[in-house]
């Protein structure tokens, strides 16, 4: 081991920093470039502030929004026979009276 100058801060010791500058490349060599690159690129850990995603509140006047109005559809009609349902209720009522 080479003797280290005690007056130097630990982060300024020779060999403590890589010879090349960190870059934005995510290749394997650049991910293992230094401890900072490894945590940021290799592990994906970032301790900075999270950026807020900006939302557009109002659409421009000329643009068409995605929520088009639904065309009006006629109300669905009941498929059963209304007269038949009235007769069946009368038959049930007459049967219950006869049973009593």
UniProtKB/Swiss-Prot annotation:
Modified residue annotations for Asymmetric dimethylarginine: 52
- Give the motif span (Nuclear localization signal, RNA-binding (TAR), and protein transduction): 49-57
Write out the ranges of the annotated region (Core): 38-48
Q: Where is this region: Cysteine-rich?
A: 22-37
Residue ranges of the region described as Interaction with the host capping enzyme RNGTT: 49-87
Which positions are annotated as binding Zn(2+) 1?
Answer: 22, 33-34, 37
Q: Which UniProt keywords apply?
A: Acetylation, Activator, AIDS, Apoptosis, Host cytoplasm, Host nucleus, Host-virus interaction, Inhibition of host innate immune response by virus, Inhibition of host interferon signaling pathway by virus, Interferon antiviral system evasion, Isopeptide bond, Metal-binding, Methylation, Modulation of host chromatin by virus, Modulation of host PP1 activity by virus, Phosphoprotein, RNA-binding, Secreted, Transcription, Transcription regulation, Ubl conjugation, Viral immunoevasion, Zinc
Where are the residues of the annotated region Interaction with human CREBBP?
1-24
For bias type Polar residues, the affected ranges are: 63-79
The Basic and acidic residues compositionally biased stretches are 80-100
Q: Give any extra note attached to this record.
A: HIV-1 lineages are divided in three main groups, M (for Major), O (for Outlier), and N (for New, or Non-M, Non-O). The vast majority of strains found worldwide belong to the group M. Group O seems to be endemic to and largely confined to Cameroon and neighboring countries in West Central Africa, where these viruses represent a small minority of HIV-1 strains. The group N is represented by a limited number of isolates from Cameroonian persons. The group M is further subdivided in 9 clades or subtypes (A to D, F to H, J and K).
Similarity field: Belongs to the lentiviruses Tat family.
Instruction: Return the protein name.
Output: Protein Tat
Source organism of this protein record:
Simian immunodeficiency virus (isolate CPZ GAB1) (SIV-cpz)
Please name the taxonomic classification of the source: Viruses, Riboviria, Pararnavirae, Artverviricota, Revtraviricetes
């Amino acid at each position: 081991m080479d003797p280290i100058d005690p007056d130097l801060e630990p982060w300024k010791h020779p060999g403590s920093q890589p010879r090349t500058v960190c870059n934005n490349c995510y290749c394997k060599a650049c991910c293992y470039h230094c401890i900072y690159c490894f945590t940021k690129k290799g592990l994906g850990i970032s301790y900075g502030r999270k950026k807020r995603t900006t939302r557009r509140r109002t659409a421009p006047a000329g643009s068409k929004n995605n929520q088009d109005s639904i065309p009006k559809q006629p109300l669905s009609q009941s498929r059963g026979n209304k007269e038949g349902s009235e007769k069946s209720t009368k038959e049930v009522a007459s049967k219950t009276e006869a049973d009593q």
